[in-house]
Amino acid sequence: MEEKKDPRYLDLVISRKNDLLYPLIFQEYIYTLVHDHNLFPTILLENLGYDKRFRFLIVKRLITQMYQQNHLSLSAANLKQNPYFLYNKVLYSQKISEGLSIIVEIPFSLQLETSFKNLELVRVQNLKSIHSIFPFLEDKFPYLNLVSDGLFSYPIHLEKLVQILRYWLKDPASLHFLRLFFHEYWNWSHPSFEKKNLISFEKRNLRLFVFLYNSYVYEYESILFFIRRQFFHLPSKPFRFFFERLYFYVKIENLTEVFSKGSPVTLELFKEPNIHYIRYQGKFFFAYKGMPLLMNKWKYYFVTLFQNHFDVWFQTDKIHINPLYKHSFHCVGYLLSLKWNPSVIRSQMLQNAFIIENTMKKMDILVPIILMIDSLSKMKFCNKIGHPVSKPTWTDLLDSDIIDRFVRLCNKISYFYSGSSKKKNLYQIHYILRFACLKPLARKPKSSVRAFFKKLGSSFLEELFLEXQISSLIFIRSSPRSSDRSNQSKVRFWYLDIISINEIINHE
């Protein structure tokens, strides 16, 4: 007789089929994975005699040196006496971090692939901007009346992250290896983590950091979403009993059974609260439709969860609850505010005419021009008031290198901000970037920018500011009970090929 699996542990056991590939962590194939994925095209230092191309033979030599060294006996004196040893250590850390990021992403890639096996692709539609992947900003937010935003105040402790990862890693050797790697090699350059000044990583090598940070966020958000579903039923005292990760899903099942058996009539009277939660770059937002008293209760649950379980301190007086129609806030790189659009409709019935005035709420999504100009000024594209500037050293570059530098930046900005409701601020950014590109090009033939621009024509670099498109894949999930097409649910999967955070969009 086949043993029946307990469904209460389904969420905890689902990852065991595609468990982490621990042997890969201790094999040389980790460097092959990093090389094949091209995560670091140029990380070798020029002053050590290496060229800019990736040499697999160099990596093999570094692997041999890595096996011969004792990493537990590292000291600051050794690093100062031997700068080449410091470079090797940084190179080891980069390769280990990039290889680990690939390995830990393998189970999630397999789960994503299996989730689409039973889905039938209906169509692929193109959308004009990144803004289309946030339809709730237009569909949901205009009907809400309260918004609360705040920041994660203090960094995450490394041991707290190891404590969360111990539920995933069943191999003690791998867990000890990660703990050693965190404390010896890693420099948390992100404000969410504690910083160490021993080793400095490249800013672009954030793939492992993104995975670890999301694993931390997943833990508290899983509890947070459960509280949202049981918001009206969850009292204050039993709140602390839902924090243990191993028994969390079991308690959810038991609590659901108690509510369904004990008070079925009461459950029908309660309506699911219209609460929306957004997390973006260390910021969190709550949007709600209802009374401020209930929003204060939700704020209390959120602060208690972080302070008592995740050891993250919040200043409750800095978490404000504001009316949405009076408050604008920054989210996903945009400046969001609620705008009232008045409309007048004239209706005539027989000899009587009626004028109906109606006001509709619409989400106004703007480019944060002040923050954008500040970011461009730090990158030396303009001054503090937005006038384009140029460095004399840029004239030493080839024309193709100058244009290529601006092409990549303009494509990213146009791709990200083409979904703004007003294009005026975006056109101002286009103006700054275009003339910042023209100034170093005009200095080579020693002509003015106006004469150089007139020679090239007004269409110069216009193709760089075209609105890019993203794809939306629409699937149909087959219904096991009926083959009727009307009973089959559609699933929309948004595809976006921006996998790195742009410095100009990542506002500090």
Swiss-Prot record:
Location in the cell reads: Plastid, Chloroplast
Q: What InterPro entries does this protein map onto? A: Domain_X (IPR024937), Maturase_MatK (IPR002866), Maturase_MatK_N (IPR024942)
- The answer to whether keyword Nuclease applies is no
- Predominant location: plastid
Q: Name one GO biological process term.
A: RNA splicing
Q: Which GO terms describe its cellular component?
A: chloroplast
Q: Which UniProt keywords apply?
A: Chloroplast, mRNA processing, Plastid, RNA-binding, tRNA processing
Q: Name one GO molecular function term.
A: RNA binding
- Keyword Ribosomal protein in the entry? The reply is no
Q: What function does this protein fulfil?
A: Usually encoded in the trnK tRNA gene intron. Probably assists in splicing its own and other chloroplast group II introns.
Q: Which family does it belong to?
A: Belongs to the intron maturase 2 family. MatK subfamily.
Protein known as: Maturase K
Q: Which organism is it from?
A: Marathrum schiedeanum
Source lineage: Eukaryota, Viridiplantae, Streptophyta, Embryophyta, Tracheophyta
- Gene behind the chain: matK
